[in-house]
Structures are given as structure tokens and as C-alpha cells.
Amino acid sequence: TFAFADAASITHEQRETGTGTGIRSIFTGFGHSAYSFETYVWVERASGDVLFEWIPLNEQGLNITNVTWPAAMDFDCADDHDTTLITHEQGVMIPNTWPTAVSTKDIAFDGRFETAGGYMPWFAQLRADGHGYIAICETPWNAGYGIDHPSNGPYTHINTWFEPSLGTMNYRRVVRYQFLDHADHTAVCKAYRLYVNERGRLRTLAEKAARNPSVRDLIGRSWVHIGIKTKVQPDSYYYDKDHPEKNESLVTFAQREKQMRTLHSMGAGRLYMHLDGWAQPGYDNAHPDYLPACQ
């Protein structure tokens, strides 16, 4: 493990371009190797956003497994209304004084973006006075977030991490910080929505329904996420050698149908069943050749 300050040589220069101004820093020499990278921290003129870029230059001599940068913000006030937002599953808001400890290991897939640990590639922190920021990872493919919140706080620290792609860091990594005033969790979500819309990546429910009218049937339904068959392979990371009976499970389609009817009769209303592991190979095997259905 090395800190950026451990580099044998560190240089800085100011850079001025048509889009913004910032500081370019080059870090060379770690652990008697020639490994080097640069960072570019700059303010975008058009938006006022601050962009943090990490760029590999010479990857010889070190086998990098993780880069943790930018570091966590100072967010250490013991205030119930100082909150951290993460896109873990359906979304989580963590007050600084929350009694339950939260760490990266508690998050699905260690907070990896574009997974259940971070369905959208952003996190945010809001002060009680409405000041805050949203951090948007513009290169989320080999990235995620780390989080540290002790029981009862008084702080929550959150930062971005990057990992190699096919053995090397290989390409530029970028995180955009947008600073907000008079913000709440709704304002943060609207900021991200505006960000993706400006880049042509927003697809509204109305647009999706125009392509697939059955989308309209989902509105107002409760989402029930369940499975039929699971079969964890012996060479899988998730295989439990100590408890092999946990590597396989099976619930019949008839049992799932009865479960849905029972929930509905108890007043659950309109339901949408998300069914995993419905094919003979079991969850999560043989994609994309998943047929036939489980018998």
C-alpha cells in the first residue's frame, strides 16, 4: 500500500484550457519502481463542477489492485440532519448519528457501481443547512465506493475506488463533484437526472412505455424479488465448502404461485414478481443460453 505522497518525484503545474482551469500533478516512483500516474483536478467553467481525473502513465513495476481517490470529504458533524446518500439497492439515506454501523463489506458487491451495491454511479452528502454535493463517477465500469460509518457516528466517510481492467489500470478515471445549495435528497436525484439528460442517456417511463406498453402495468405494483433454483458451482467465489448444502436450493413454480396469491389475499395489492433462477441450469449459470425452464 502506498500513499500518493510516497512518490519519489512529485511535480505540479497549472493548466488553463478553453473548458476550465486546474492543477496537473505527476507522481513517479513507488517502491523502487518507475510506476507513474498523473492527477488533474480542475473546475469546469460552464458548470462550476470540479472534476478529479486519475491517469496512468507508466504501469511498469507494480501490480495495482486498487486506487482509492479522491479521498473522503470532511463530514464529521454529529447532526441527525447531516446525511449520506448511496444508490445501494432501492437507495439508502444514512444520518451521521445513525445507530447502525455501515462499512463497505455491508454493501452488496463492495459498493461496485452498476450493481445492486450502486445501481447508479453516484453518491452524495448533505449538510443540515442544505449545502452538499453529488459525486458522479463518469467512468464507472471498474469502480465503486467505500463507506465507513461507525455505530452512532458521529461521521460518515465515503470515497471512490478504482480497480484494474484486464490486469492494468489502462485508462483515465474521472469523478465529477457538483456542489449544491438548498438541497435535499430529491434535489440530488434531480441533479443526476439533469446530468444524464444533458448527455442523451435519460429514458423516461413515458419513453419506455412507448416502446413497450406493458411498462404502464408496472406502475403502482409492489416488486417481489424471488427465485426458483440456485446451483453454485464448485469453482465459484460464492461456493460454500464448509456448508455444501447451502450451494443448492429449489422452490417449485407452484409454491411461488401460492406465495403470490397469499400475499395478494393478505392485502398486498398489485404485485410484480421478479423471478430469478427459473431455468434448468439454476441461478446464475449458462447465460445467455438459459433454456429450458426448470423442471
PLM regions: where:
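Carbohydrate-recognition beta-sandwich/jelly-roll modules
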Residues: 1-285, 290
